[in-house]
């Protein structure tokens, strides 16, 4: 039995999230159907992070076990030939038995793309969040500083969250404006259900001046979801990258087809 890892990208706007559902309109259902067609045998996948309805995948990682012997490029091209245009396998790589797409991961990175303009753009529908009024980027960055570190993030946790603990370690939140867009980057060991969208809701409240910077610390300390802002829209949220130990040599996400994804790589080079 061989263990194969795949890098997967998808447009989350047309799916009811990642996880398999009875109606079948999920990314997992489509991917496993394509793998079954290509491999001519049922394939069960394990995913790094189960994204919600409307959330996109740039750097999603899955693994599965199979007895078939196929070249890496065959897994990519063969599976893609059975996938809809809204899902694409970017790479395939054999892995040792100890690799696990979910449990071997030590960090996840999400991007949120927010369009700031008086009028919404149909060209960005389901690709970016939208607010009509200017936001204070410096205030949002200052508020984000209150969240860095290991904390109980219950105030940013949905009622449907199945995580065993609300305690997560948030390593980084960056906020950067580029023209009419504000780009957010969130990096943590793991995230709770709706955590990034709930963080976004609070950051936007502060950016609008509806709450002071210090309010973010109060929300965190409250551990009360009702004390925080409403959950923000999923449209601009992307699972950007999953971090693994170097021993597994997991390929970096192929993000060149998404122009705004260079915001953070350009920042790293300056």
Swiss-Prot record:
Reaction(s) the record says it catalyses = uridine(38/39/40) in tRNA = pseudouridine(38/39/40) in tRNA
Listed EC numbers? 5.4.99.12
The first-level EC class reads isomerase
Which residues constitute the signal peptide according to the record? none
Keyword Transferase applies: no
A GO MF annotation of the entry reads:
tRNA pseudouridine(38-40) synthase activity
Q: Which CDD domains match?
A: PseudoU_synth_EcTruA
| InterPro entries attached to this UniProt entry | PsdUridine_synth_cat_dom_sf, PsdUridine_synth_TruA, PsdUridine_synth_TruA_a/b_dom, PsdUridine_synth_TruA_C, TruA/RsuA/RluB/E/F_N
User: Catalytic positions?
Assistant: 52 (nucleophile)
Q: Which UniProt keywords apply?
A: Isomerase, tRNA processing
Q: Origin, by domain of life?
A: Bacteria
Binding annotation for substrate: 110
As for family, the record states: Belongs to the tRNA pseudouridine synthase TruA family.
Q: Summarize the subunit comment.
A: Homodimer.
State the function annotated in the UniProt record: Formation of pseudouridine at positions 38, 39 and 40 in the anticodon stem and loop of transfer RNAs.
- According to UniProt, the name of this protein is tRNA pseudouridine synthase A
Q: Which organism is it from?
A: Paraburkholderia xenovorans (strain LB400)
